[in-house]
Amino acid sequence: MSRYRGPRFKKIRRLGALPGLTNKRPRTVRDLRNQSRSGKKSQYRIRLEEKQKLRFHYGLTERQLINYVRIARKAKGSTGEILIQLLEMRLDNILFRLGMASTIPAARQLVNHRHIFVNGHIVDIPSYRCKPRDIITSKDKPKSGALIKNSIEAFPREELPNHLTLHPAPYKGLINQIIDTKWVGLKINELLVVEYYSRQT
C-alpha cells in the first residue's frame, strides 16, 4: 500500500488531529466524532483506527509500519513504546518536531531535495534513524536556510520535547536523548496498534 496523498482534512475528520499530516484541526466536535453516528465500534475497528492514526501521522506506507512493528517486537522492552521511539527518531519527524518543517510531508521534501545535514553530511533519506548527540542543520545555501527560517517563524513550537534542543539562527537542532514517550505529539494507544498486527499474523 502506498503513502497516502489524498485529502488530508478527510482523514482528520475521521481519526482526529494528525499534526504530522496537516496543521489543520477538526473544526467542531462533530468533525472529531464524525463516525460516531454509525453506532458502537467493534474492537477490530478501534484497533484499525489507532493503526491508521499512526500510519497517517508519520506518513508511512503499510509495509513500512509493518517493518517497524517487527523491529520493535525483536527489541527488549515494551513493543509499543519501542515502536513509538523508532518512529519519533526518524529524521523527517525530528525536523517536524523541531519546527524546521510545518508537517512531516514538508520535512520529507526538505530531506529528499538534499537541504538537510546530519553531523555535517547531507542525508537524503527521510527514514534515517537519528540518535543522541546528532546535530541537524540546513545546507549552507540561502534557499535551504530560508526554507527552515520561514517554517520556524510561521509555525513556532510552543514547547519542544525534552529530547530536542533548537539553537537560534543559524538554526541548529540537537538530539539530546531517545524520546520519552510522554512527549509524543500524538494522542495514540500504541498497544492497540501492536494488537492489530498481532491478530493479522
UniProtKB/Swiss-Prot annotation:
<comment type="similarity">
    <text>Belongs to the universal ribosomal protein uS4 family.</text>
</comment>
<feature type="domain" description="S4 RNA-binding">
    <location>
        <begin position="89"/>
        <end position="149"/>
    </location>
</feature>
<dbReference type="GO" id="GO:0019843">
    <property type="term" value="F:rRNA binding"/>
</dbReference>
<comment type="function">
    <text>With S5 and S12 plays an important role in translational accuracy.</text>
</comment>
<dbReference type="Pfam" id="PF01479">
    <property type="entry name" value="S4"/>
</dbReference>
<dbReference type="GO" id="GO:0006412">
    <property type="term" value="P:translation"/>
</dbReference>
<keyword id="KW-0699">rRNA-binding</keyword>
<dbReference type="Pfam" id="PF00163">
    <property type="entry name" value="Ribosomal_S4"/>
</dbReference>
<dbReference type="InterPro" id="IPR005709">
    <property type="entry name" value="Ribosomal_uS4_bac-type"/>
</dbReference>
<keyword id="KW-0694">RNA-binding</keyword>
<comment type="subunit">
    <text>Part of the 30S ribosomal subunit. Contacts protein S5. The interaction surface between S4 and S5 is involved in control of translational fidelity.</text>
</comment>
<dbReference type="GO" id="GO:0003735">
    <property type="term" value="F:structural constituent of ribosome"/>
</dbReference>
<dbReference type="GO" id="GO:0015935">
    <property type="term" value="C:small ribosomal subunit"/>
</dbReference>
<dbReference type="InterPro" id="IPR036986">
    <property type="entry name" value="S4_RNA-bd_sf"/>
</dbReference>
<protein>
    <recommendedName>
        <fullName>Small ribosomal subunit protein uS4c</fullName>
    </recommendedName>
</protein>
<keyword id="KW-0934">Plastid</keyword>
<comment type="function">
    <text>One of the primary rRNA binding proteins, it binds directly to 16S rRNA where it nucleates assembly of the body of the 30S subunit.</text>
</comment>
<dbReference type="GO" id="GO:0009536">
    <property type="term" value="C:plastid"/>
</dbReference>
<dbReference type="GO" id="GO:0042274">
    <property type="term" value="P:ribosomal small subunit biogenesis"/>
</dbReference>
<dbReference type="InterPro" id="IPR002942">
    <property type="entry name" value="S4_RNA-bd"/>
</dbReference>
<keyword id="KW-0687">Ribonucleoprotein</keyword>
<dbReference type="InterPro" id="IPR022801">
    <property type="entry name" value="Ribosomal_uS4"/>
</dbReference>
<keyword id="KW-0689">Ribosomal protein</keyword>
<dbReference type="InterPro" id="IPR001912">
    <property type="entry name" value="Ribosomal_uS4_N"/>
</dbReference>
<dbReference type="InterPro" id="IPR018079">
    <property type="entry name" value="Ribosomal_uS4_CS"/>
</dbReference>
